[in-house]
Amino acid sequence: GERPSRGRRDLRAGHAGRETAAAWDAFRAWAADELPASDAFAPGSGTPLLFGEALYLLPASSSLPLSPDHLAGLKVPRAGLHLGDVRKGRFQPAHALAMALGAPEAARVWTLGEDSPSAAAYLRGETLEVPADLRGWHLVTIACGGASFPLGWGKASGGQLKNHLPKGLRQHC
């Protein structure tokens, strides 16, 4: 389908039935494996909205109930939390989702030291070397002052952690 103009999205495009349900099911299946400790995406947590391949979650709120019908016809920059993109039936998580999570919620976490060369390499968008037995999506975090903070996603395979940090957020030095 046609993609909405950059920076603005028409909510009428996201109020589809079967495609949205299929995208939501793909996300829920991915989340069951990758985010087993998170209850943020349980039924009733919000309304899924699909724009092309991009899946968003419009949060539920008792104080301000919103639905796609309430927002129909409005131009909005982001219709909630960008969960990820569904391509060919497979879910790929969005950077915004990584930023919304804590390390305990993810099934697999790769933590970098705050002053480590690996942290600098990740922030430049480079692929990292990891143990060969690591597989799948990892929430990449940085350890700082006894806590871990999310940086983004990496996908491990064959001894490498492929960097999924958005290009616009990468450091150029």
Residue ranges and their predicted role:
Residues G1-C173:
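Polybasic, low-complexity RNA-engagement segments
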